[in-house]
């Protein structure tokens, strides 16, 4: 959504430019040597803050990607304190808008019977300002997504370690990961 977007260097939320993205994807799809076409990450805040131009891009993704594609969204943490301390660029409200947007277009089944395009969600443990309540906020967000009937293709939970990051409670991290896998992944995925 940010490839050749307007204001990439100047704006907090650059305005997506569908034309160059469409050109790349339609061109790639026309290549007979290509069997599978997927993308990697998308910025949910860009989608949420620019719904109109994002619609055309999302339709192009759904039309050209192989079914089972994932558009990973890096929320990292649902905790506003962690968001602020680490200069994260997406908040839970923006994330929900972007997930709903991708669900609106991407849940259609492809040739292999899989949804064409679903969002993935990335969490990072060990960011500055994180507490046990941060994990609770992450779980609450996931519960909301499940309650709203929104689909995710996968949930990635990683931990960051090293200089500049805080130590994490291994017990809190394990409990969070276990709850996500048992209470969210199984019914949602």
List where the protein language model places each region.
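Auxiliary Fe-S-binding modules of radical SAM enzymes
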Residues: 30-34, 106-114, 136-139, 143-189
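Catalytic cores of alpha/beta
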Residues: 52-58, 127-146
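A generic "cationic amphipathic patch" detector
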Residues: 84-86, 134, 168
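Conserved SAM/AdoMet-binding glycine-rich loop
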Residues: 1-120, 125-128
